[in-house]
C-alpha cells in the first residue's frame, strides 16, 4: 500500500494494489487502489477509484470529479457533489449532503440534511435526519426522513416500497409515488401529485390539498383526526 503522512496534491496518476492513505487530499489526476482509499478532507476534480472502500472527512467532488467504490463510501463530515459518485455499497454521511449532479449507490444512503438538485438513485434506502429539499430526481426502494425542520419537494421522488416523512412542514409541489406513504407533520401542503399503490396515512395533520393538487391511493387513504382542506382531487378506490 501507499501511506502519505501529510497532505496530498495529485495531478498525475497514483496507483496501488494495496491501500492508499493520506491526510487532506486535492486530486486533479487519477488515484486508483485495488483495496481502500482513506483521506481526511477530500477535494476531487479528477478520478478516484477504490475496489473496496473510500473513507474521508469532508468530501467536495467538483464538476469533473468522479468517485467510485466497489464497496462503501463513508464521509465523517459533509458532502457536496457536483460530479459523479458511484458505489456498489452504501454511502454513509455523518454530516450534511448536497447533490447537484449524479449519485448512484447499490446500498443505503444516510445523512443529516439532504439537499438534492441532481439525480439521486439509491438501491436500498435513503435515511435523512435533517432538513430535506428535493428539486431534482430521486429513485429509491425506501425513504425515511425524520426532521424537526421542513420537507420540500418540487420535482420528482419515486419510492418503490415504503416512504416515511416526518417534519415540521411537508410541502409537495412536485411528484411523489410510493407503495405506502406515512406522513407525520402538523401541516401538509400539496399542490403537486401524490400517487400511492397501497396506503396513505396522515393522522393529526392540517391536510391542505390546494388547487391543482392530486392525492390518490389505489387502496386506502387514512386521515384520522386531520383537518382537511381540499381544493384539488383526493382519490381512494377503497
Where are these regions (language model features)?
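Extended beta-solenoid/beta-helix repeat architectures
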Residues: 1-238
Amino acid at each position: 500500500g501507499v501511506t502519505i503522512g501529510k497532505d496530498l496534491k495529485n495531478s498525475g496518476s497514483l496507483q496501488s494494489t494495496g491501500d492508499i492513505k493520506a491526510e487532506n487530499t486535492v486530486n486533479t489526476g487519477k488515484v486508483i487502489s485495488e483495496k481502500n482509499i482513506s483521506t481526511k478532507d477530500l477535494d476531487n476534480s479528477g478520478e478516484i477509484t477504490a475496489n473496496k472502500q473510500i473513507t474521508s472527512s469532508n468530501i467536495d467532488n467538483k464538476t469533473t470529479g468522479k468517485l467510485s467504490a466497489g464497496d462503501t463510501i463513508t464521509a465523517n463530515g459533509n458532502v457536496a457533489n457536483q460530479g459523479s459518485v458511484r458505489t456498489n455499497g452504501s454511502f454513509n454521511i455523518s454530516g450534511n449532503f448536497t447533490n447537484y449532479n449524479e449519485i448512484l449507490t447499490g446500498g443505503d444512503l444516510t445523512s443529516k440534511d439532504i439537499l438534492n438538485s441532481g439525480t439521486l438513485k439509491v438501491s436500498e434506502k435513503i435515511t435523512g435526519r435533517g432538513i430535506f429539499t428535493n428539486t431534482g430526481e430521486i429513485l429509491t426502494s425506501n425513504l425515511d426522513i425524520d426532521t424537526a425542520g421542513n420537507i420540500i419537494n418540487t420535482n420528482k421522488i419515486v419510492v418503490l416500497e415504503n416512504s416515511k416523512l416526518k417534519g415540521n412542514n411537508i410541502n409537495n409541489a412536485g411528484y411523489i409515488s410510493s407503495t405506502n406513504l406515512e406522513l407525520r407533520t402538523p401541516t401538509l401542503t400539496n399542490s403537486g401529485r401524490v400517487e400511492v399503490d397501497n396506503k396513505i396515512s396522515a393522522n393529526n395533520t392540517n391536510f391542505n390539498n390546494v388547487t391543482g393538487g392530486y392525492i390518490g391511493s389505489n387502496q386506502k387513504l387514512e386521515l384520522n383526526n386531520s383537518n382537511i382542506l381540499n381544493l384539488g382531487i383526493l382519490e381512494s378506490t377503497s
